[in-house]
Amino acid sequence: MAESPEEPTFQRLGPVNWLPEERKLVERYETEIVELRRRLEIAEAKAAYAGWKLEATQAKRTFKLGEAIGSKSPGKVLEAVRSKSRAPKAPMPVTEAVELANHRPPLVEVPKAKWPLGPVNRPDLRVAVILDDFSRMAFKYEWDQIEFGLKDWPEIFADKRPDLLFCESAWHGNQGRWRYQMTGTNAPKEPLRDLVAWCRAEGIPTVFWNKEDPPNFDFFIDTAKLFDYVFTCDGDMVPKYREVLGHDRVDVLQFAAQPRVHNPIQQKQGRLHDVVFAGMYFRDKHPERREQMETVLDPVRELGLHIFARNGEVDDKYGWPEKYRPHIVGELPYDQMLAAYRMYKVFLNVNSVLDSPTMCARRVFELSACATPVVSGWSRAIEETFGDLVPIAREPVESYNQVLHLINSPELRARMGHLAMREVFDKHLFSHRVDQILQMLGRPTQLRSRSISVVLPTNRASQIEHAISSVAKQIHRPLQLIMVLHGLDIDPVVVADKARMAGITDVTVLPAAPELSLGACMNLGIAAAEGELIAKMDDDNLYGEHYLSDLVRAFDYSDAELVGKGAHYAYFEGRNTTMLRLPGLEHRYSFLVQGGTFLGTAEMFRSYGFPDLTRGEDTHLVRRLKEDGVKIYSADRFNFVYWRSADAAMHTWQADHIKLTRNAQFSFAGRPDDHVLI
């Protein structure tokens, strides 16, 4: 929140972080809605049955004859005798309708997530692809993607020559245009052979990725033999590929997340629901997966488990056992599943492949990128890839206890989700996978780190070392510090040397006259900034080492020009307590972010600048951005603490404790370092 003397508007807590009494109220309303819906369905069934009885009676010849006699019209009597009206079709019996209403699963409304348009990460890299839908939609943000069919590729390639051919183990391929070309009788089929042969003749490298290993190795190995380079999702299969293919151009390529669609941006309603599983049931295949369902899913049914799956008209071998059917809330297409990822507090995962060091469901990467906690059955890949970031349930009681604990622990959920998200954004994005491919080909990879200039004004000599330490500890690089000495009679060279000794190599220290406003000091720093992004940091607040590296990620998935923290922790030194302020403003677009957490594009800061004010300068900037429709994004709550000194005179905003805590939750007594600076 931009700290200013102005009255902040009221902001209700939740639904991101419900207070217990609010959660109980919501649950009561949800129960009442279910009961009203049940009664309505029964009433509608009775009305439909009564209507049918009336129509059926009116359609009978005896009814029409009696009506005609009553009218004393010979013509109508004759017409009634000759009439052959069909009786209307009977509706569902009321008893069946009541039974159905009593056992209907909960109603879950899931919006469709939008696939954003916009730039790709490597517009100068043209890649022709044959991919199934999930990979096709994820990779399209990474390069200039060329999609084609069996017959039109020569014409397309003549107009747009690819730098690389990248194919995965596709069942349908490019929306069905390459269906069954890699598997089945006589596979790989001639069109695929011709395509790869043409690329080889033209000097275009060809890459194949088997995402179906290890169970479907035999289905795709003959296709893999056509390609120059081969990747597998299972690290244990690399030696076998090298043996069969006769070369060592083989490596591992795990699944990944695409931040443009797999990100923590909340739907308006937040995480309304508790726990969910999404997937199919296999009666005859994958016995390990079925066993994990009994371990992971079955004990959680009494916690209000939802299941997204097909129900009703499915083959018996894919039909869910009876005990799970009341929990099935419908089947979701992928664009709705993306929204569902951010509507639940906990997602469950089970595994078909247990012993691979690298092969696990892509959904675990996607959910973690959404900061959604996952509880999973055991697999070697999940254990080695995510460690304790994904809790493992080996016994039913472990599943029950872990899910219940997460449902009841909003602070733990936020912390666990944040750390898992960081792991994926650091190591497991599709950008990382493209880097792996390019490295295998001996081609240069892309530097993704944005340069940041930190503008940090201070008018307190006693805070200079703390301010330098806050910036020096940041793991993000490249990093520039621009410190503005506001009315301080200190040699800028001495301050710059201190910053360099702390490990900051790019330092500029500017003197500023004491009569200048804080806004004017910020503008001095902005004018000297060289970074792609500019951060405003304060000299007294606490910043964790991951503060900037976490915050800058919002530019990978949001359309914001300014990001910051609406939800944030505040430490009240005089009371030795830590509060979570504005908990509902986390992972969502907002016009309320804390002034000490501003991180924006250099272009935006130079276009708008700060007003010539000492108090409320950040609030006025935010208001101008709002008026002009410039998007502001409020990220996570971690790695920043608004420090409220016991001496109120230390702050430009002279607000009392009650005003500062009225939109806050009490978190704990004591300092926040261990919990917040992670």
Language model features with spans:
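Glycine-rich, basic loop-to-helix element that forms the pyrophosphate-binding segment
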Residues: 512-529
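Short, acidic, metal-binding catalytic loop of nucleotide-sugar glycosyltransferases
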Residues: 469-478
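Short aromatic/hydrophobic "clamp" motif used to bind/position activated sugar donors
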Residues: 534
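A charged, aromatic-enriched C-terminal amphipathic alpha-helix characteristic of glycosyltransferases
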Residues: 411-441
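C-terminal catalytic/acceptor-binding lobe
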Residues: 418, 608-678
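Conserved donor NDP-sugar-binding/catalytic core segment of glycosyltransferases
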Residues: 546-577
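Boundary detector for helix-to-coil junctions that initiate low-complexity/charged tails
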Residues: 1-104
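Nucleotide-sugar donor-binding catalytic core of glycosyltransferases
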Residues: 96-160, 169-172, 176-178, 184-191, ...
